[in-house]
């Protein structure tokens, strides 16, 4: 739980409904007050075109135990979306120096999870190094299978929206 406490205290970019900066707040306060932050979603593919899906640990504050279609997280105060994406991909999956492509942004609005989201993709066949505090397991599957599984398994709705934005682009 030390990781969760440190994560909750992290200063996060606070924005309005048009993604204009308003300042920074601790992650937990942003969530508890229903305010809007910025998030990144990095869809990691292998060279066979399979998508890395990860199961979130049960200690996560949002969607514990759910399958996630993207690495990523909250953008820190003063941090550009692209820098956040590169940082999160390395922290969560151990992938560094991958070429990131941005595919667009969307506003996700659900109680306890209000975000302006930037969607990126990367391709890598490097071995994964999972961040144990955040990810309990990972596997590569076809993106279509992930969408099919999401009908019966718990998948994060924000990363589902990120994948749909990517597929529709």
Curated annotation (Swiss-Prot):
GO terms for molecular function: hydrolase activity, acting on acid anhydrides; metal ion binding. Keywords: Hydrolase, Magnesium, Metal-binding. It is an enzyme of class 3 (hydrolase). The keyword Metal-binding applies. Its cofactor is Mg(2+). This is Uncharacterized Nudix hydrolase PA4841. A motif (Nudix box) lies at residues 81-103. It comes from Pseudomonas aeruginosa (strain ATCC 15692 / DSM 22644 / CIP 104116 / JCM 14847 / LMG 12228 / 1C / PRS 101 / PAO1). The keyword Coiled coil does not apply. It comes from the Bacteria.
